[in-house]
Amino acid sequence: VKCTNKNKKQTQNSYDAARRRKALRKRRRRQQQIVTVLVILILCLTAIGIAYLIHSGSKKDYVIDYETKNYNKSLYKGDTFAKDLCVTSNNVSLEGYADDDSLGAAGLFDIKNNTVLYADNIHTQLYPASTTKVMTAYVALKYGNLDDIVTISENAVNLDADAQVCGFEAGDQVSMYDLMNGLLLYSGNDAALAIAEHVGGSVEAFVQKMNEEAKALGATNTNFVNPHGLHDPQQYTTAYDLYLMFNACSKNPTFIDIISQKSYSATITSADGDQWTTEWIPTNYYSAGEATPPEGVNVLGGKTGTTDEAGSCVILYNQDMESNPYISVIMGADTKTILYDDMTALLAVGVGTKSSKN
């Protein structure tokens, strides 16, 4: 019996020891698993940290490099770009001036104080007609040479019979300066094509440059497909974009000198060597003496545009009695009478009253 009890006790002890060893192995496995997980976690965190530092450093270097190269360019120029411009995203009323709902758009801009005095639908896309030639002039003045002598091509005179033209014939030779006068004063479509071919190498290349320069000026709601403004459904702008382009042109004294003239005599040399002269009268009624500016307002000049689709349009450079500059624009009037009646009323209230108070 004693032997049996002893055997039972030994058996129990062996069982208990085995259970303890099993439990110990189990704990060790758990500990090893925990250690393994912790090691993996530490390695992962270390790798993430290293990657972050590398990425952060390269990103910082990239940002610094980008800022160094692009400061005062693109988005960095936003504040500077708008600082010298009249800016509004909404309509602006002008006390004393009654809105004309029949117009496509209208605006009056105080250039000295960078203030929008009046705005009605100035961000609405409309057909520009020959106000297109404002951008044609901008590109020509920027990239062309006014002393160049240009030979008129067959393409430049290949226009519909009812198109406004200066009267050139293929083979005629005329200076770039004369062409600019024909473009801006008389709104010659043949002058626009001749300028585009000479300055751009081709009409297509010149129009591409027009679009590039328009975007650079902030005229992002504008698209050109030709340099003259004869109707094309893919050619459009806004009254505000037109202000931006005209305002840029007005910084060039030559542009102001040309549009301020009451007439211009051009000298043309024909293909056979004969010379002849022609006189161009401005198409805007104020400069031509067919409309009278309001008291206290001096209309220096501007650019007109008229097609069936665009209606009657005009953009003007004006001064008050203190010679402070203003740009006024009306697009989409049903008739020229309405166009100039509304423009006179707008200038009288927005500019003339300021002069009377000085």
Residue spans for each PLM region:
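Hydrophobic single-pass membrane-insertion segments
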Residues: 49-63, 351
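Hydrophobic membrane-insertion alpha-helices, especially the h-region
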Residues: 37-51
